[in-house]
Swiss-Prot record:
GO annotation, biological process: glycerol catabolic process; glycerol-3-phosphate metabolic process; glycerol-3-phosphate shuttle
Species this protein is from: Arabidopsis thaliana
Cofactor(s) for this UniProt protein: FAD
Tissue: Expressed in germinating seedlings. Also detected in roots, leaves, flowers, developing siliques and germinating seeds.
Gene Ontology cellular component annotations, sorted alphabetically: cytosol; mitochondrial inner membrane; mitochondrion
EC number, as in UniProt: 1.1.5.3
Protein name: Glycerol-3-phosphate dehydrogenase SDP6, mitochondrial
Subcellular location, principal: mitochondrion
Topological type in the membrane: Peripheral membrane protein
Top EC class of this enzyme: oxidoreductase
């Protein structure tokens, strides 16, 4: 860090401030997105606020897709059940359109469950905007800030503000980062979560006890802290899909598109041939427009029309690791501002553990990507320079890789320079493809895709987009203190076994977990725990209850053991060995819910074990409640 960098930052800040002017506080999408809705939105909000409301059954959803014939098609058929695809389904159905969605695996089974768990407010775009005097990058900052704010408000039980600390071992670094983040505060305006601030070295150590006092022969001068958003990504994705289902969309996971249907006369895409991967049954489902939101696999959908289609996806691998809770204090993240190859690495508290990452490298597209050992070691090396504790490979509880579907730029030489922004295009009539983007902006991406679908199919929505102000399932009536109701009602419950009275398994930690994972639906899970004898924990040291398996099977389209351990409950991501120990009981409960025979139970166990093998934990490490023994 140099004086020249600080001068350049100051000069760029002045130009950006002058260029943006009053637009800093402008939020043009709010007014347009808050219009309309009418009876459709009113009805949905009543269902979302009804604690007894349930999504349609899986068989009913499949029947609705089959009922979409050539003479009576859907308005929109979405391929892909990740954040973008589920967002498209929710946007379209709340505009009064007839909507279907199919996902070949599970909601959030791909990239959407393998994120850094951050809802970025575009702080890195601001740095590029300042140094490159790029107003386009500044607009991305405005957009990310607005979408972050709305996402946190629309799913408050799953999203929250998180302070992130940047260590400074040079006074120039202190000035540089402080100036940059104060400019960020100014640009954020009413979208700001909390003001950034400087902490002295002593204050920083009190806030983050494992922070290194020295780095590269320099003493810690202090830290600069700003706030970003954090989320439970896959549960947010499942919430999107279930909200869309409650609104009337026919959503079906474990349903794969095997081919697209083309009108022989017009050559327009008019539907898809779909295979139910649980039963093997195939059927046609027709639609006026098909939206390809298959993430890293969107090129494979495009190639169903033309095998020679030029790829639009540049796949990038992002690896994360999970460490015990003592690596980071609860409620404070750490940013490694520059690794040996110039990247940024985050170390964040998440669901009682610490998640660290990520990497950024070219990769091939696969349904179950695996982290390489050198990528895991890269992250460990990056954080070790900033911590005063020994960072060990044996502390890794879980490690996973996700594939970012970056929009291809043929002139780019590395994935870091390829745009993270999204692209919507229609190269074949009737097939709208959306790719790129990031979790933070999924909602506006979906809005753009639905706008394109309406134009393509000359559809007639009953109202404009309403998703900006639409709270998701579990959000209505939820408060941060909602867990206390669960604690007071269920913590002291007693059960009698053979005349011996023992306390129920639910404690305050479990009550907090249920409240944040399920929001206002948590009471239904607690009731199952109490009334059906499913109050035991699935794995020691984790708050997940047996009742969650039953609830997710009944109300969240949980159709496999992997669906549960990876995406309904996050135990596979948090602690691979604990997930393996919980597997048998998870399969037993799912078997009871779905009437599986012994053969199916054996298959589920094997598939789940193979899935867990892709999470590179430390087999020789022994943990208890996230602490190393």
């Amino acid at each position: 860090m140099s004086l020249a960098s600080i001068r350049r930052l100051a000069a760029g800040a002045a130009v950006i401030a002058a260029a943006s002017g009053g637009a800093v506080y402008l939020s043009p999408s709010v007014a347009s997105s808050d219009k309309g809705g009418g009876p459709i939105l009113d009805s949905l909000r009543r269902r979302l606020g009804d604690p007894t409301a349930s999504v349609p059954s899986r068989s009913a959803q499949e029947s609705a897709l089959i009922a979409a014939t050539a003479s009576d098609p859907l308005d929109v058929l979405v391929i892909g059940g990740g954040a973008t695809g589920s967002g498209v389904a929710l946007d379209a159905v709340t505009r009064g359109l007839r909507v279907g969605l199919v996902e070949r695996e599970d909601f959030s089974s791909g990239t959407s469950s393998r994120s850094t768990k951050l809802i970025h407010g575009g702080v890195r775009y601001l740095e590029k905007a300042v140094f490159n005097l790029d107003y386009g990058q500044l607009k991305l900052v405005f957009h990310a800030l607005e979408e972050r704010k709305q996402l946190i408000e629309n799913a408050p039980h799953l999203c929250h503000a998180l302070p992130c600390m940047t260590p400074c071992f040079d006074w120039f670094e202190v000035i540089y980062f402080w100036m940059g983040l104060k400019m960020y505060d100014l640009v954020a305006g009413p979208r700001l979560l909390h003001l950034s601030r400087y902490y002295s070295a002593k204050e920083s150590i009190e806030l983050f006890p494992t922070l290194a006092r020295k780095g590269k022969d320099k003493n810690l001068r202090g830290t600069v802290v700003y706030y970003d958003g954090q989320m439970n990504d896959s549960r947010l994705n499942v919430g999107l899909a279930c909200t869309a289902a409650l609104a009337g969309a026919a959503v079906l996971n474990h349903a794969e598109v095997v081919s697209l249907i083309t009108d022989d006369a017009t050559k327009r895409i008019i539907g898809a041939r779909i295979r139910n991967n649980l039963t093997g049954q195939e059927f046609n489902s027709y639609a006026k427009v098909v939206v390809n939101a298959a993430g890293p696999f969107c090129d494979s959908i495009r190639k169903m029309i033309d095998e020679d289609t030029k790829p639009m996806i540049c796949p990038s691998s992002g690896v994360h690791i999970v460490l015990p809770d003592y690596y980071s204090p609860e409620g404070m993240g750490l940013i490694v501002p520059k690794t040996k190859d110039g990247r940024v690495v985050f170390m964040l508290p998440w669901l009682g553990r610490t998640v660290a990452g990520t990497t950024d490298s070219n990769t091939s597209i696969t349904s179950l990507p695996e982290p390489h050992e050198d990528e895991i070691q890269f992250i460990l090396d990056a954080i070790s320079d900033y911590l005063n504790i020994k960072v060990r490979r044996t502390d890794v509880l879980s490690a996973w890789s996700g594939i970012r579907p970056l929009a291809m730029d043929p002139t780019a030489k590395s994935t870091e320079s390829i745009s993270r922004d999204h692209v919507v295009f229609e190269e074949n009539p009737g097939l709208v493809t959306i790719t790129g983007g990031k979790w933070t902006t999924y909602r506006s991406m979906a809005e753009d895709a639905v706008d394109a679908a309406i134009k393509s199919g000359q559809l007639k929505p009953t109202n404009e987009c309403v998703t900006q102000k639409l709270q998701l399932l579990g959000s209505y009536g939820w408060e941060p203190s909602s867990f206390t109701t669960l604690a007071q009602q269920y913590v002291r419950m007693k059960k009698t076994y053979g005349g011996k009275v023992v306390p129920g398994a639910m404690d305050t930690a479990a009550a907090k977990h249920l409240s944040h994972a399920y929001g206002s639906m948590a009471d239904r899970v607690a009731t199952i725990a109490q009334e059906e004898g499913l109050g035991k924990r699935l794995a020691h040291g984790h708050p997940f209850l047996e009742a969650e398996v039953a609830y997710c099977a009944r109300h969240e389209y949980c159709e496999s053991a992997v669906d549960f351990i990876a995406r309904r409950c996050r135990i596979a991501f948090l602690d691979t060995d604990a997930a393996a120990r919980a597997l048998q009981r998870v399969v037993e409960i799912l078997a009871s819910e779905h009437k599986w025979d012994k053969s199916r139970q054996k298959q589920e166990l094997q598939k789940a074990k193979e899935f867990l093998e892709t999470f590179k934990s430390s087999k020789n490490a022994q943990f208890n409640d996230g602490k190393h023994n």
